[in-house]
């Protein structure tokens, strides 16, 4: 099966990434990607875009040359309370909210601290998807996190970049996470975590994890634009007519 939805991509607004919005559109069109999200790092990261970047995402068109674009953020989980670096009514203006641990904002601590932070972030209602929860720098109680995510309709990401250029040692953790989410009845989503447009929609290693555990395709949000958009609507985001052309 070809997966034509990607929820995790960074532009040059995060200055350790190397592609523009237009670069991503060109690659998406060439690869036949139907829907992707621009999710630059939240403002507490040292080289992240200014807060206004996210406020002004309203200027981005939702459909360009047949490709759907989601306005999003990869927020930083800041502390054990699960707080993130984007807040209030501004969150409601975004189409998708990812959040995860990043060393400059939340330095690695203990397994219990990481688990508490993730569960509190999940329970806050502010986060749709937890990014790279398999990061070996942040050990977690996988069953507790998977159970909380399933209960609160939050998806956990299998991050393809973790197997390639960062967070080496994630494979066993991601297999454990996928098995736990499967058992809990929860949702997974694959993210390329692209920092250059060429990797948009590339999920080869993440797919291996999905196939290894026999994860049910009907609970994988990348399976179609409709699956992801329905999930986001169920999470309280606006249902937008502009995306109707993406639904088969």
UniProtKB/Swiss-Prot annotation:
Can the keyword Metal-binding be found in this entry's annotation? yes
- Gene Ontology biological-process entries: bacterial-type flagellum-dependent swarming motility
What EC identifiers does the entry list? 3.1.3.-
Comment on bound cofactor: Binds 3 Zn(2+) ions per subunit.
Residues bound to Zn(2+) 2: 16, 41, 195
Q: Which family does it belong to?
A: Belongs to the PHP family.
- Quote the protein name from its UniProt record: Probable phosphatase Sfri_3709
């Amino acid at each position: 099966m070809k997966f034509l939805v990607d929820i995790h991509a960074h532009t040059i607004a995060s200055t350790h990434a190397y592609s523009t919005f237009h670069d991503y559109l060109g690659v998406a069109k060439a690869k036949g990607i139907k829907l992707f999200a621009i999710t630059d790092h939240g403002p507490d990261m040292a080289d992240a875009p200014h807060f206004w970047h996210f406020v002004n995402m309203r200027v981005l068109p939702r459909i360009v040359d047949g490709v759907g674009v989601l306005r999003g953020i990869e927020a930083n989980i800041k502390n054990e309370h699960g707080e993130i670096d984007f807040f209030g009514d501004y969150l409601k203006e975004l189409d998708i909210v990812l959040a995860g641990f990043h060393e400059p904002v939340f330095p690695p601590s203990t397994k219990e601290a990481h688990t508490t932070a993730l569960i509190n972030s999940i329970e806050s209602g502010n986060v749709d998807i937890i990014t790279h929860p398999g990061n070996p720098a942040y050990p977690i109680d996988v069953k507790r996190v998977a159970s909380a995510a399933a209960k609160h309709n939050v998806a956990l990401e299998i991050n393809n970049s973790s197997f390639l250029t960062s967070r080496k040692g994630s494979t066993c953790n991601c297999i454990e996470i996928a098995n736990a989410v499967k058992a809990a009845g929860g949702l997974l989503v694959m993210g390329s975590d692209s920092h250059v447009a060429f990797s948009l929609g590339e999920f080869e290693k993440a797919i291996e994890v999905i196939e290894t555990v026999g994860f049910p395709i009907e609970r994988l949000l990348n399976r179609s634009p409709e699956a992801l958009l329905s999930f986001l609507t169920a999470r309280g985001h606006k249902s937008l007519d502009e995306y109707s052309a993406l639904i088969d």
